[in-house]
Amino acid sequence: MKKTLAILMALVMVLGACTFASAEVKTYKVGISIYQYTDNFMTLYRNEIAAYFKTLETDEVKYELVFADAKNDMAEQTNQMNNFVTQGMDVIILNPVQTSSADVLIDIAVSNEIPLVLINREPLAYDADGNTLDEAYEGILNNPKVCYVGADARQSGTYQGELILATANQGDINGDGKISYIMIQGDPENIDAQYRTEFSVKALTDAGKTVECLDSQVGNWDQTKGQELCANALTVHGYDVEVVFCNNDGMAMGALTAIQTAGRIVGEDIYLVGVDALPEAVEAIKLGDMTGTVLNDHIGQSHAAVDVAVQLLKGEEIQNYYWVNYVKVDKAYAAAQ
């Protein structure tokens, strides 16, 4: 009897070992195209994507990430999407170069039955006459394996305006009854840039303020360009400039250099606001060198994007849109970080 039990136990152990040995590790291939690596915010975003995917790996499931820099070139990004198809990606995460042409990229994924998660730059839709509609590209809404993860840029613009309204003189530094500002915009085709430009000023007019736009220029999210545009505006308009609105913190940091070079003092004779809450911007707010910024939550957004990508890999149902809220960052908030 003891001998029989011993044989049975040995068989169980052998079978168990065979089962363990035969268990295969499933590796999913994830293609990730970022519109431009030099963008400060998207650098934080893509690094967090990589880090978060790593935390989700198990003994049975691994993720092979293939990152690609589109270099702000639509043709380059289209090639990357086609390469992802050739490489047999199981899911694609896409940060589109041109939101107005995202349908081309969406169609590549859909026609090849590859799940697609668009991030950060919301695709646009147009009517038959080419007029922009206030909704995203219908290819997202009409496909169960395509979604967008981002934040409502109208909220970020509104928060910028509210940061100005929260100052002691509500933005009217010289007391002439109007708020005179310059606007440094990101990519004019980007819906986030459009909404931040519109709603930052709308927050002021909705509060009953009279505004005057002294200058509005395109900085394409670039810090050096932001410095150049702000310097030019300060040279032309001098102390008439009371507020500098920047569509992102990269350009705001450039504007800060121009402001300091011109001998102006943020909080005394000029205000400066951005968006993203980059570490250097938050530090500038702590020091009083920036009026405020708006937290564009790269951690929340990147985690949401990865989570929905994993859901798609599992064949689970998803929503077409996932929104992550912005947060106002003033001196008190910055000091608490």
Regions from the language model: what does each represent?
Residues M81-N82, V91-S111, L116, Y195, ...:
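Hydrophobic alpha-helical
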Residues K26-Y28, Y37, A128, L133, ...:
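Hinge/cleft segment of the Venus flytrap/periplasmic-binding protein
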Residues M1-K29, V85-T86, D107-N112, A332-Q337:
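Short, low-complexity disordered leader/linker segments with a strong preference
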Residues K29-E57, V66-Q80, Q87-M89, N95-S100, ...:
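Extracytoplasmic "Venus flytrap"
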Residues L56-A70, T205-Q223:
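Short beta-strand elements in bilobed, periplasmic/extracellular small-molecule ligand-binding domains
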Residues Q77, A136, C147-K178, G226-Q227, ...:
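Hydrophobic alpha-helical segments within soluble ligand-binding/sensing domains
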Residues L105-Q155, L278-K286, T291:
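Flexible loop/hinge segments that line or gate small-molecule binding clefts
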Residues F41-L56, S156-L163, I191-T210, K225, ...:
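Short, solvent-exposed amphipathic alpha-helices that sit
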